[in-house]
Amino acid sequence: MTPFLYRIAQAFYKKYGNEISRLAFVFPNRRSGIFFQKYLAEVSGKPIFSPKVTTINDLMAELSPYTLIDRISLLVTLYKKYIELRKSDETFDNFVFWGDMLLGDFDDVDKYMVDARQLFTNIHDLKEIDEFYLTEEQIEIVKRFWGHLFFPSTESDNKQQFIQLWQILFDLYTGLRDELSSRNKAYEGMIFRDVAERSKRKESINLPYTQVVFIGFNAITEAEKIFMEYLRDIGIGDFYWDYYAPTLQDSYNKAAFFLNDNKRRFPSKIEIDEHIEQTPQIELISIPSAVGQAKQATDILQSLIDNNHLSPEKAINTAIVLPDEELLLPMLYSIPPEISTVNTTMGYTLQHTTVAAL
């Protein structure tokens, strides 16, 4: 099977040759870009000047006048703005958990170009929150949620705290944006929205590339869509979708509707040989323990190596997806000795390290 990224590299090098250095290739994540560069080196067979290989996040940041702020500084800024608006004595420790959730919501609001004023409408302009409209299960969930955040003592406090927060959400959102903008800082969604709004106004965006090629995207946000439409309309946007799995060709598959819409709205300039993949074979194995899962994965790898179905030198093409980060170390210690190099792309919480036990 020829990998999708290999076929992309092959097609573009065939058309552009050494001039490929004048192009920019945009991927949804860094890992895709690394493999693309690897395949491009294989295709060229000689040293060449590399094209720009970047992620959509990095490209947006490159085109925005704002500097991306780190998460901790962002939380502190939000906390100060919250205390100012709420006139509250809430501690930062108690704020961090749900403040991080609010930042996620603000990020989504901007990436999906939502009208924040309408979304964060004052709760008094909506129906009064009344337990009459909720099931007992919903009531219990609301109580548990707000109880964790504010530790209310009565049922009326649940409603009151909720109303008070909703009263300031829009001011909190705009206040945070204004504060960051005054410091020439921004969170990721704010950067996306800035670039998208400029694209929507057809402002000139200085791009030092003859073509900007988007590869391997799936679900795209509204801000990304507007930016991609802008590049398409000025003639430098090019798009390639890895939508060849049999399940995605099924017209009755609801996901296929959105995927086909992407292909229709953002067509490819170069024809890439479509490789229709076979339906994957899936085998389920019941394992009673977490460590046993790592051991079973090791046994499978060893069996593949022993039967010449897996070359240790090309093990990079084999993926092991763990259901829990706690399995990372048992898995790494169990890798067959024939495999000398692994690429790990998952986090490992501090609470599971030996340092946390000190």
In which residue ranges do the predicted regions lie?
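Nucleic acid-machinery interaction/catalytic patches
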Residues: 1-358
